[in-house]
Curated annotation (Swiss-Prot):
Entry protein name: Uncharacterized protein MTH_215
Organism listed in the record: Methanothermobacter thermautotrophicus (strain ATCC 29096 / DSM 1053 / JCM 10044 / NBRC 100330 / Delta H) (Methanobacterium thermoautotrophicum)
Main location: membrane
Keywords in alphabetical order: Cell membrane, Membrane, Transmembrane, Transmembrane helix
Locations listed in the record: Cell membrane
């Protein structure tokens, strides 16, 4: 059976994306938590539950949520970046918590704390990943480029601090990390302010 359709009209359907921009959530989750951790690295206070809680919640969950939202928008870079660094924070919290779990000690399956070589390897791989991600940022705004190159430097400084055992290098890394976190906070808040006002008030 054959049907003939005549005078068919073509209509253009425009679908508008009304979902929010997830990048500020991810950038602020990363930035604030990074500043707090690196205040510790700079020697201002010892590692404590505040850093672990922030690493799990705002550093981890917020960035993973941002990653899922970026996925729904079809943004591969945002998906990989926020997802990876969100899971980085979770892995760092686990590295600090697992050796101190009492029930593992009583069951005879306690894991030893990561030694300096293991931690240096861990930090170096994250530095390498960040450096390669920086290449992708060369097509993005300058603020994102600053965040990624400074984060790569931070990871490599922390790697050097672990290998050498130098408190000075770790302290320098801490101050550099504070700058990295502040850069992420600035870009995140700038995007919120610019979008709210409907024009570019703060450059990114």
């Amino acid at each position: 059976m054959m049907y003939k359709v005549r005078n068919m009209r073509e209509t253009e359907v425009v679908i508008s994306d009304k979902t929010a921009n997830p990048a500020p959530l991810g950038l602020l989750g990363f930035g604030i938590t990074t500043i707090l951790l690196n205040l510790h690295n700079a020697g201002l206070f010892p590692i404590n539950s505040m850093i672990l809680a922030m690493g799990f919640a705002y550093g981890g969950i917020a960035q993973i949520l941002a990653s899922v939202m970026e996925y729904r928008k079809g943004n591969t870079f945002g998906t990989v970046a926020f997802g990876s660094y969100g899971l980085f924070w979770w892995s760092l919290v686990l590295l600090l918590v697992i050796p101190n779990l009492k029930f593992l000690e009583t069951s005879g399956t306690a894991a030893a704390s990561a030694d300096p070589v293991a931690m240096a390897s861990y930090l170096f791989m994250w530095g390498l990943f960040t450096l390669l991600m920086f290449i992708a940022t060369l097509k993005l705004k300058r603020g994102i480029q600053v965040i990624f190159i400074s984060l790569a430097v931070l990871f490599f400084l922390l790697t050097a601090g672990e290998i050498t055992g130098s408190a000075l290098i770790t302290a320098v890394a801490g101050y550099e990390g504070i700058f990295t976190g502040a850069a992420a906070m600035y870009v995140g808040l700038a995007e919120v302010i610019n979008e709210t006002h409907g024009r570019d008030i703060l450059p990114t």
